[in-house]
Amino acid sequence: MPRLEPGMARIRVKDLRLRTFIGIKEEEILNKQDVLINLTILYPAADAVEVNDIEHALNYRTITKAIIRHVEENRFALLERMTQEILDLVMENPAVRYAEVEVDKPHALRFAESVSITLAGHR
């Protein structure tokens, strides 16, 4: 993860719990499962700090709503695909300089709490 430089802000969305179709086994194809999504986003925030106006900030609510809609309305065979599609949604915002997306699938393995995939993008 890039170092946080002066004038930059780091936004973290933690444990966004959604339900979707994820997996390749029959029961996964037929039944929605929980996934936990964690986001880290870096963007230049000097204007937002100075002006104190949402028009100058990265609106994490807008990004989160787009992710919720996309994840809940689609089906995914692989965590890798879901993670990349979420990362693509985040990176659509031109203010984003760096983003990291982790998708966690609880109880994906019998003796593990969860399995997760993390992908990152930057410009």
UniProtKB/Swiss-Prot annotation:
Q: Which GO terms describe its cellular component?
A: cytoplasm; cytosol
Keyword annotations: Isomerase
Enzyme class per UniProt: isomerase
User: Which Gene Ontology molecular function entries are recorded, alphabetically?
Assistant: dihydroneopterin aldolase activity; dihydroneopterin triphosphate 2'-epimerase activity
| E.C. number | 5.1.99.7
Q: Which GO terms describe its biological process?
A: folic acid-containing compound metabolic process; tetrahydrobiopterin biosynthetic process
The reactions it catalyses are: 7,8-dihydroneopterin 3'-triphosphate = 7,8-dihydromonapterin 3'-triphosphate
Q: Which cysteines are joined by disulfide bonds?
A: none
Mutant lacking the gene: phenotype: Deletion of the gene abolishes intra- and extracellular monapterin production.
Keyword Isomerase applies: yes
Q: What is any Pfam family matched here?
A: FolB
Q: Which domain of life is it from?
A: Bacteria
PANTHER family in alphabetical order: DIHYDRONEOPTERIN ALDOLASE 1-RELATED, DIHYDRONEOPTERIN TRIPHOSPHATE 2'-EPIMERASE
Q: Record's family? A: Belongs to the DHNA family.
Q: What's the subunit arrangement here? A: Homooctamer. Dimer of tetramers.
* Job description of the protein: Catalyzes the epimerization of carbon 2' of the side chain of 7,8-dihydroneopterin triphosphate (H2NTP) to form 7,8-dihydromonapterin triphosphate (H2MTP). Is required for tetrahydromonapterin biosynthesis.
**Name of the protein described by the UniProt record:** Dihydroneopterin triphosphate 2'-epimerase
Q: Which organism is it from?
A: Pseudomonas aeruginosa (strain ATCC 15692 / DSM 22644 / CIP 104116 / JCM 14847 / LMG 12228 / 1C / PRS 101 / PAO1)
- Gene name, per UniProt, is folX
